């Protein structure tokens, strides 16, 4: 009998979900659905039960350390590496410049990158809203070089397999994991680059939460608050002052192409 339900019953359900290993976000999703359902029940006079959303303690999101990033950003020797290994290094740089989701990285096409304008267009995003993301100077140089090796048509995927096809979700994750392990970094999560981008953008690069919201493609600022507290910043500063990639590469050597014929 739904009318016999008490708050204690719902508390017990939350405890059972927590004991089953569900994440706070998953538990919140379930309680949000129940809250909507019982709001309707209350309107119909079936119950008088108010369900608060599950509140969990905010935990600090794991990120890559500067030492780990330095190892991951070390450029492979193009004369000795495979295309896949070189591509993975470019993707690592792209993730740290843009804070992209893995699905977005897979969806970017060659035509979406405007190197002269210094931006990349996201046409396929989680919230189905197109985005324009700035590229810092080091990222532009890296993509120019990558484009010369990658080749392809404008509608081809920017980050492809060695046969030119789109990377699968598992293929991308496995490639990044292998790259990290080759560099001696035990963390292998591609999503950690998104967390790292958010932390470094705000703390190390002086960015602000409102601009970060746009860069991460969050629909509301509340979503961005899961990554950070709000910081004030000058929105007119050059993106090179904000980009985590530019900050890591400050003072670094320019890209050198191998001699022709080798």
Briefly describe each language-model feature range:
Residues 1-262:
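Conserved catalytic core of the tyrosine transesterase superfamily
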